A protein has these predicted regions:
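Glycine-rich adenosine-cofactor-binding loop
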Residues: 7-18, 23, 135-156
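A glycine-rich, Thr/Ser-enriched phosphate-binding loop motif common to dinucleotide/cofactor-binding enzymes
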Residues: 108-127
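Rossmann-fold NAD(P)-binding glycine/threonine-rich loop
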Residues: 85-105, 225-269
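Rossmann-like adenosine-cofactor binding region
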Residues: 60-82, 175-251
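N-terminal ligand-binding/catalytic initiation module
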Residues: 1-93, 97, 101, 263-274
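Helix N-cap at the beta1-alpha1 junction of Rossmann-like dinucleotide-binding domains, i.e.
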Residues: 14, 37, 169-170, 226-228
């Protein structure tokens, strides 16, 4: 399809503001509703959606827009494409209405690019919280997915002594091949006392109250995973604990917006430059 694209950007954080600016900078008609720090925005939802055939919700889509999903569905044009991150249960409602949708949080390129931004921000947070210099510090990374792999590489390049915690044998073997120490998740025993920093990327319990007793009080604890996270609730009382979820939107919102825009453009078969 080669329809003229007209965008409506709804709610969200600074990523949505930068996304709106980028779309307008590329010459696309783009209206805004409840986008923060944006003066030129529609007074109501219906005004924002008038003539729009691409609706862009934030990530997460349902809790971040500030607008009930039912209102958006009722006001959207029948031929509109609804774009949002982590649509989840909204997909059923969209299908029931016969509306087209795109969950950009499932786009593999976006996930990799967001992981890179997350790893960069996590590195900065670690530098602020480690009890000593990064070079020579012993860092445990729980989980060896996209973020874990990228962060491990950055830390090792800067001289950290990196240990990777994983459950799958192939992940443990890959960690070994790449030059990291390795340990099976859950088999920490008293070894946690050796680490200067522990970074969790696993959205499931990893370090419980019993394991936490072995962690030094000056250890930097960085929680990157979505809820429920990997650290037990007691970890939050430790001075080195930091809940650092959603880092791309907080530390690099303009770059994160460009990543979202690129994912949507790929879905629409649009060129980056017009």
């Amino acid at each position: 399809m080669h329809l003229k694209r007209s965008f409506a950007v709804i709610g969200g954080d600074l990523r949505q503001r930068f996304l709106l600016r980028q779309l307008r900078g590329l010459g696309f008609p783009a209206a805004a509703y409840r986008v923060p720090d944006t003066e030129d925005r529609a007074p109501d939802l219906s005004g924002c959606l008038q003539g729009a055939n691409v609706l862009i919700l934030p990530m997460p889509a349902l809790s971040g827009s500030g607008v009930p999903l039912a209102e958006i569905l009722n006001a959207a044009a029948p031929d509109a494409l609804i774009c949002g991150g982590m649509l989840g249960p909204a997909e059923d409602a969209l299908r029931a209405r016969g509306l087209s949708y795109f969950d950009y949080a499932k786009d593999e390129a976006l996930l990799l690019q967001n992981a890179e931004l997350t790893a960069e921000a996590a590195l900065s947070l670690l530098l602020e919280r480690l009890p000593g210099p990064l070079a020579g510090s012993r860092i445990l990374i729980c989980g060896f997915g996209r973020i874990g792999k990228l962060l491990a590489r950055k830390l090792k390049a800067l001289g950290a002594d990196v240990t990777v915690s994983a459950r799958k044998p192939r992940d443990l073997e890959l960690a070994h091949i790449l030059g990291y120490r390795r340990v099976t998740t859950g088999s920490f025993a008293d070894a946690l006392a050796q680490y200067d920093g522990i970074v969790n990327t696993v959205p499931a319990p990893v370090i419980g109250p019993e394991q936490l007793q072995c962690v030094r009080r000056d250890c930097a604890l960085l929680e990157l995973a979505s809820l429920p996270g990997g650290f037990c609730a007691q970890a939050q009382a430790l001075p080195g604990y930091c809940a650092a979820r959603g880092l791309p939107g907080k530390y690099a919102p303009e770059a994160a917006a460009a990543i979202i825009r690129s994912a949507i453009f790929r879905e629409l078969n649009l060129e980056e430059a017009r």
